[in-house]
Design a protein with these regions (language model features):
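Short coil/turn segments at secondary-structure boundaries
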Residues: 4-10, 220-225, 237-243
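Charged, amphipathic alpha-helical linkers/stalks
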Residues: 192-237
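Histidine-centered catalytic/metal-binding microenvironments
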Residues: 235-261
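Charge-rich, low-complexity amphipathic helices
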Residues: 75, 174-175, 230-234, 242
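Catalytic-core regions of glycoside hydrolase
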Residues: 1-205, 212, 249-258
Length: 261
């Protein structure tokens, strides 16, 4: 066997789908922000599991996720030093608002501190499936946000993973697979920036467009510039409007749709 075991709660484990036994319910705190409601409960179990592993296999490590209502670091407890954590965020690509960007950074730095600032113990997973999977087929691109994120976090982690959409993923159905193609330009940019976050976004984008579209490159550059500016330059506030309405009434109003056409 390898030197690291993996444990994660079910991907769909939201508060209503978590264990409802009396012992577990006592450990939930629904009065806290969503990402903190079950952190103590989840990581107390992870800590016990890690110590049990250490007692039998002293050189083994336990890898786990910080996600959903246990995304924030637990307060007032120690994480065993044989535990590695991957922080899962679904909102970095929405972080054109500096406040939202900084809130995510604060959680990342809190986790790093709890793991004794060991970059090899801390990973970041950008879970980017919205809006293309569930909300809207409108293309979205966020290369400048992504670059800022990589530069801001490269001293606290030595790994960053991004899941996206796969045109061959059968569980998504035909419509879901077609949605995947609209994300490919951003997937390409992400791949290049992961290798070197110092790259110029403008130069990378032009390289992609020139090699992909040939004689239509100038037109497609204007198209992609508009997509980027409408995503990165207009923050969405969930408190004021649902995302579908925001995308189709604000981000892409009638004037912008005519411009894209």
């Amino acid at each position: 066997l390898g030197k690291e075991g993996y444990f994660a709660f079910n991907d769909g484990m939201t508060p209503e789908n978590s264990c409802q036994c009396s012992a577990c319910r006592r450990q939930y705190n629904p009065a806290l922000p969503f990402e903190k409601q079950a952190s103590g409960w989840a990581f107390r179990f992870v800590a016990r599991y890690a110590e049990a592993i250490r007692a039998i296999w002293p050189d083994r490590r336990l890898a786990t996720l910080a996600y959903q209502h246990y995304q924030a670091p637990p307060e007032g407890m120690r994480i065993p030093d044989n535990v590695d954590v991957t922080y899962v965020t679904k909102i970095v690509h929405y972080a054109s608002d500096p406040d939202l960007f900084n809130q995510e950074l604060e959680k990342v730095h809190a986790w790093s501190k709890l793991l004794n600032n060991k970059t090899e113990r801390f990973g970041i997973w950008l879970n980017i499936v919205d809006p293309a999977t569930y909300t809207s087929k409108v293309p979205f691109m966020y290369p400048n946000i992504f670059k800022r994120w990589l530069l801001a976090t490269r001293d606290v982690t030595d790994s960053c993973f991004i899941n996206g959409l796969n045109s061959r993923l059968n569980r998504s159905g035909e419509e879901g697979r077609l949605n995947a193609f609209s994300t490919y330009p951003m997937v390409w940019l992400q791949s290049r920036l992961l290798w070197n976050p110092e790259y110029s976004v403008d130069e990378l984008l032009w390289d992609y467009i020139r090699n992909s579209f040939g004689p239509a490159a100038d037109t497609m550059r204007r198209f992609h510039d508009l997509i980027i500016s409408r995503w990165e330059g207009i923050p969405w506030s969930p408190e004021t409007m649902d995302e579908i309405a925001f995308i189709h009434c604000v981000r892409y109003d009638e004037e912008r749709v005519r411009e894209l056409k």
